[in-house]
Amino acid sequence: MREPLLQLSGIRRHFGDGERRVEVLKGIDLTIARGEMVAIVGASGSGKSTLLNILGCLDQPSEGSYRVAGRETSRLTADALATLRREHFGFIFQRYHLLGDLSARDNVALPALYAGLAGDARKARAERLLQRLGLGSRLDYKPSQLSGGQQQRVSIARALINGGQVILADEPTGALDSQSGAEVLGILGALHRQGHTLVLVTHDMAIAEQAERIIELKDGAVVADRRREPTPPSPAPTTSRADTGGRGGLAGRLGAAFKMALLAMRAQRMRTFLTMLGIIIGIAAVVSVVALGRGSQQQVLANINAMGTSTLEIFPGSGFGDRRAEAVQTLRVEDAEALAGLGYVHSVTPSLATSVTLRRGSQAVLGSVNGVGEQFFQVRGYRLLQGMLFDAASVTALAQEVVIDENSLARLFGAGESPLGQVILLGSLPCRVIGVVARNQSGFGSDENLNVWIPHTTAMTRMLGQSHLRSISVRVQDEVALAAAEDGISRLLRERHGAQDFFVLNTDSIRQAITSTNATLTLLIAMIALISLVVGGIGVMNIMLVSVSERTREIGVRMAVGARTGDILQQFLIEAVLVCLLGGAAGVLLSLLIGVLFEHFSSQFTLSYSLDAVLMAFFCSSLIGVLFGFFPARRAARMDPIHALERE
């Protein structure tokens, strides 16, 4: 007596509700023993394919009990049913249902992939089966390169890769010529003799007669169940089960999903590119905006540093725009000398300025004459190009010595002509040139201005005839906080003046304000750029939904051969993330190209890239792939396998 393997009791299956309810199976009671070869026959609409789908756990009965090897299936989850299909069943379809992008070898190996079999073992087993079925020379052929009979043999090999304890064949010869059909039936007969349980659905009684048991359906009910002379029992085949919990199985599935993602992208190159385009533009915009903001911040901070690091500027009046500031004449050289005596002060320079005509020979230009102390160039960090700077002795002696900048040098002297020792007129005051400094790069005034510097005593006495200063520049020691130094300096000047008739400009405050403003603007523009990235993500979701719709049959095939819900979810999620990652990489490259073009065509804009920004771009593109790819992937994973298989 053979052991019962498949047991159906009171199986009913209906579709629709109410007036539209259609009864397809009506109380099927059936037991199929291990090692039997059963043919299910009947006219179209008799319910034989629906019964086969229930036997293969592709569909669930509306009522009744179905047990596989004693295990009740009605309460099993989708993943548990997938495991049951993978470990017990092998499917042979009338239309083969091979994946067109995969080779014969990879199609056969697909169920073993979901069973967790390692890559080399999976490949070797698939090759052995194909060689056994006469396809050893066509391992790498795609389905489109094979004949119908060869495709059906690939389908048979796929059914056997995990052991094929039960082979379910739905009209296996229906799409074949007579010779190929006879070959397929011969293979199925051989499998039966080897101990496999075969359930064959056909409408051809001549084919059914080759089975040892024939079950006839009519209008959803069994009307006949007759047996022929049984084939001598053979040992049941051993189902080869891999360790599905091993890391190798997960790695194999991830690798295969990655490969399938590349194949899907390559099959639709233009669509993939257009999908990526939104991500490319979004990532390029975000990275470029962040780089521009970072570059602008660095440039502004460099300009502030060019004014002098750790410096305080003291001006008369209550602030910029104070109309009474011109009348305030209390800022004196003595104040500068008092400030120089403070322990936390590094250097001090008085300052006053006026605009006059600079003349040398026939050359006459308008320039700015600055009366400063000997420490001015140290406070402001000017770089000496030629000659020397005036010293304390020159200040004391009211020396008529002048230091000029590069712009003045270019306008007053010929190319290659040395200015040192030459006399120029500052208005009507003759002064001897003793040095040349680099042009102003502070960014708080044009670097095209013409500037010359003379001792402040000379400017006050010989040129302007005044005793008050326009400003005092103070550089504090590096280890001293500017805010604390500002408080001390303000307190000293209030004591000297008896009133708050001055204001202090703290370069550190400017730096902080500009940094904060720049960060805010960068964030604002980056948020605008992120909108384009979100639009790109919506495009990815749209295309992935289209892809799921187009590949519904592929999803059904994967589920039929044992793919779990998580496997399908993983497959489509990897595709979405891969599209976004490649788009992110292209976006970063585009941003770098934009930076090169900016540097080449414009010196006013500097893009400063950072590794953090690039890594953040890849993180954002991956996140977009996960967020916008999850819904299409979940939709694919929740498909009903039989409905997916039946959809063209």
Swiss-Prot record:
Pfam families, alphabetized: ABC_tran, FtsX, MacB_PCD
One MF annotation (Gene Ontology) recorded for this entry: transmembrane transporter activity
Biological process per Gene Ontology, one example term: response to antibiotic
Keywords (A to Z) from UniProt: Antibiotic resistance, ATP-binding, Cell inner membrane, Cell membrane, Membrane, Nucleotide-binding, Translocase, Transmembrane, Transmembrane helix, Transport
Domain ABC transporter: residue ranges: 6-244
GO cellular component, one term: plasma membrane
Listed transmembrane segments: 273-293, 521-541, 578-598, 613-633
Annotated EC: 7.6.2.-
Residues that coordinate or bind ATP: 42-49
Main location: membrane
CDD domains recorded: ABC_MJ0796_LolCDE_FtsE
Keyword Cell cycle (UniProt): no
Membrane topology qualifier: Multi-pass membrane protein
Region feature Disordered, mapped onto this chain: 222-248
Annotated compartments: Cell inner membrane
Its job: Part of the tripartite efflux system MacAB-TolC. MacB is a non-canonical ABC transporter that contains transmembrane domains (TMD), which form a pore in the inner membrane, and an ATP-binding domain (NBD), which is responsible for energy generation. Confers resistance against macrolides.
Family: Belongs to the ABC transporter superfamily. Macrolide exporter (TC 3.A.1.122) family.
Subunit (UniProt): Homodimer. Part of the tripartite efflux system MacAB-TolC, which is composed of an inner membrane transporter, MacB, a periplasmic membrane fusion protein, MacA, and an outer membrane component, TolC. The complex forms a large protein conduit and can translocate molecules across both the inner and outer membranes. Interacts with MacA.
Protein name (database record): Macrolide export ATP-binding/permease protein MacB 1
